[in-house]
Amino acid sequence: MPEGFSVMNPYEHADVRRVVTTFCERYYGGSRQRLPVWGINPGRYGAGLTGLSFTDPNALRQDLGIESAIVGRREPSAEFIYTMIDAYGGPASYYHDVYMSALSPLGFLRGGVNINFYDDAGFMREIVPFVIDCMRAQTSYGLRTDACVVLGTGKLKQFMERYVQPELQYQKVHYLEHPRYIMQYRRRFIDDYVTSYVTAIRDLVGN
């Protein structure tokens, strides 16, 4: 790790491992090939706490029905994602079709503040093999290999096209605006973004 960086690994906590196990048993059963939806890396108030991408403690209890001692504030990206999931038909329908994760299952802090791995050019280059290995490992669970959705249209798109696509070679990659960007800068258009998410995912799923 570069000087001043630290790793955020939610899976070192027993309650997080229990939550993730409960979630997978409840929502990821069966042998269906799910569409991968990739984010960046865990943030402090979402997956960094719960171990589940774009899921804060509130969504964990209220939307997924999983009780836990994990506490934390409402996280904007989780708020958007679970609004979208509700529009899709609810968690059971959504996770029947979709596997949602991140390019890196570990989060990163610099000076105690959340950072995306691509925000530091040197660190970004060094983390590429780790990201590819993590994506391949998750794909081996039985995910679709022909298509995916990526939540990010700026630096994450550039990272995908430069480093990931040559390795995983998806035939179709659909890029959507990141939930954080929507909630911070385009919140008044949230309904339009929810519709665009649901439409894009349903089109790729074939529903």
Kindly label every feature range from the protein language model.
Residues 178-189:
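Short, charged, surface-exposed secondary-structure boundary motifs
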Residues 168-178:
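Short hydrophobic/aromatic-enriched beta-strand-loop microsegments
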Residues 151-154, 176-179:
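Short, loop-centered acidic/histidine patches that primarily coordinate divalent metals
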Residues 1-147, 154-162, 166, 184, ...:
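A polyanion-binding, active-site-adjacent surface
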